[in-house]
Amino acid sequence: MVFSNNMEYEDGIVEPIFGAFYATPAYENVNFNYFREDADYPVQQKLKDIDEKTENELLKDNNLIVIKNSPEYITNKQSNTPTNRILTSLFSKERLKFILQYAIVYVEEEVTGKVAYQKHIMRYPQLFATQAIATKIDAGQNKGIIWHTQGSGKTALAYYNVKHLTDYYAKKQVIPKFYFIVDRLDLLIQASSEFANRGLKVKQVNSKQDFIADLKVVGAIHNDSGVPEITVVNIQKFSEDAIAVKDISYDINIQRVYFLDEAHRSYNPKGNYLANLINSDRSAVIIALTGTPLLKEVAKEYDSKMLFGNYFHKYYYNMSIADGYTLRLIREQIEGNFKMEMKEVMDQIKAAGIDKISIAADTGA
């Protein structure tokens, strides 16, 4: 569905008021999504102007010939209006085919105490990132970074790519095997739930032995129903030599695809884990997902581009703020007397022998 008042977006507004938006029906609230074209992946088909004779016939057939010279009608005919731009973006032949095939999913969610199926649709950064991944793989780039700001749906992006890359590799007569790698138990549970709610079969791996066993299995799925599958791996308890596997069975028809969640955080460039992950299957596709900028001190020792390759796609904070998904940070001057009070409190805490880390942990910061 498209909703438009034919006005330009007012960036940074949490509740969309002005602009042209797309959405899918929902059990309760309908979420309006912005759409902005990506210069690297432009829409392929453009609308053609019709001749005046055809225009008159259409207006006459709909008993609307009277509006032909009205200012509103003349404005609405222009191809660069917000409404016509989004219609061209979403409903051009190839783009619509892609959306219908890959961009819509039913998600099982609990609403007001009852299980219901919500219909979700890709946000535009997810759509272009999905196209970017296939384009980069086509160009021979088997590893790269998706930098999407926090809260932009990186787990959902991985789900969409299970669908898209399955068909992509099917054309090459290759069967992909998908892994989503996290570094905490709670993230394993959360990601597994999100994938399962979208209809994927989920296998969980919590130990290095299970991971090694999984890598040695010939075949892409573990279920006997043929349902698309993803293996969610928690590396929190893995040792540095977790997957130094020399005799891994190699199936020429299997393509392993690793999605590394929060890639800025979990993979020590000085350790062996990442090297072993790559060495376990040198032909594997590695897609690093992150949305957190590195501190300058950390970035000096930790060049994510060196570890994971170039950026496949980027969706930064400024765009997320403009789209209303991220609130803008507002810096305010702290009053002088409040600074003094805080200093006194910190001095008292220091005198009591409590460190700052303990305070942060206790407050859940």
Feature-to-residue mapping (PLM):
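Structural recognition of the conserved hydrophobic beta-strand(s) that form the central parallel beta-sheet
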Residues: 2-4, 231-234, 285-290
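Short basic/glycine-enriched coil/helix segment immediately N-terminal to the Walker B
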Residues: 138-142, 170-171, 223-227, 242-257, ...
